Amino acid sequence: MSPGGELSYASVLSVVVALIDEHKPEPVEVTEASEFKSDLNFDSIGIMDLVADIEDHFEVTIPLNELSRMQTVGQTATRLLALIQGTD
């Protein structure tokens, strides 16, 4: 996404889901309520790899203390949108 483009929750969520799909060897159902560890079986290294890809895609840095607020896919999209828009 271009930094100047208009982002919505739905567009951020869509990108996060696509990036999750790239990290999973087999197709997995991803919803807003999906938890990274329990539902999607990400370990800590997998989460950090995903975070790096998210940061690269959106050209944003996610502070480590934000990760505790990003337990589900929906929470991640919400926090990302706030970081990108500078509303947090």
What are these regions (language model features)?
Residues S2-L40, G46-A52, D56-D88:
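Phosphopantetheine-dependent thiolation modules in NRPS/PKS and related acyl-activating systems
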